[in-house]
Amino acid sequence: MAIVSSITNHSSLPNDKGEERLVGPSLLREELKLSQQDSLRPKSFDDFVGQSELKKVLEISVKASLKRGEALDHLMLYGPPGLGKTTMALVIAEELGVKARVTSAPALERPRDIVGLLINMQPRELIFVDEIHRLNRISQELLYPAMEDRRLDLTVGKGTSSRMRSIEIPPFTLVGATTKPAALSSPMRDRFGITQRLDFYNYLDLENIIKRSAKLINLVISEEASQQLAKRCRGTPRIANRLIRRVRDYAEVYSHSKKIDVEVVNDALDLHRVDQRGLDATDRSYIGLLVNQYQGGPVGLETLAAGLGEDSTTLETVVEPYLMQIGFLQRTSRGRVVTPAAKKHYLLTSPNNIDK
């Protein structure tokens, strides 16, 4: 099924001021080039590994809409980045047998962007809007009648001579993806008939994703190697696929082979400074500052940001969530505190207590 992509000005673009993180959840520049034609993306519910409850809900909804010959209800997918929201939207389009138009909220800043997207649709088409929480108020208000009543309400003319004109549009499905569902206006949230969360993946699902991806790029990976990779990818398929590509590069250059064993995985990821819990140099610097200079905390966020030379928002939204997820960090009213598990891991992986 053809995919029409209009992704521009995407916030998943890496920050030009900072270094791209191999284990960061945002898309890297090289991954943006792969776009929706990424060969590792599943094309059906059967190919999509993990998220079993979500898949069951969506399979029922898709089959029911096909049986009735109607457009699928508008769908909101939310959760941390890299878990497959875009992929799931494309899978749904394939299962429905319709075209998917892929865009993002920053590309829909002007009313004419929304109008141009909606008036050129075919019946039952799927429109995927990434970062939908970033839509401005005018764009959201244009979508209200489109989602609920299948019409566009446009203002024609200016001043006292202006008048409202309504244009009927075909039935369609809007799939909105967001990491911040609470940032959407209440009227916008209410217009989604289906709202589902994507969760972090367990090790078994990640192993299966890694094995599937390895097969698609003609690698032979051992059981132990896939297990080791699964431990390092932070519960995130996007990171799993990114790491397996880096391991492939290493194997082709140093082993001259497409066979991946655990030694190759360890050597490749040690080279990239990704340890056995998926922590990179940035994570270890954060923990190291707390352990070495502040005896584990509590320490204020701004103090940590100054000590690391990082923006406090970056620390709060990019670095800290995973450390909290694995039980290495606590946010308290007095500041940030590392846990005993974090101290133990840091001392084991950084013998000199410094990771510059």
From Swiss-Prot:
Q: Where in the cell is it found?
A: Cytoplasm
Residue ranges, compositional bias (Polar residues): 1-14
An example Gene Ontology CC term for this record: Holliday junction resolvase complex
Q: Which residues form the signal peptide?
A: none
Cross-referenced Gene3D superfamilies: 1.10.8.60, P-loop containing nucleotide triphosphate hydrolases, Winged helix-like DNA-binding domain superfamily/Winged helix DNA-binding domain
Q: What is known of its domains?
A: Has 3 domains, the large (RuvB-L) and small ATPase (RuvB-S) domains and the C-terminal head (RuvB-H) domain. The head domain binds DNA, while the ATPase domains jointly bind ATP, ADP or are empty depending on the state of the subunit in the translocation cycle. During a single DNA translocation step the structure of each domain remains the same, but their relative positions change.
Question: What's the name of the protein?
Answer: Holliday junction branch migration complex subunit RuvB
Species source reads: Prochlorococcus marinus (strain NATL1A)
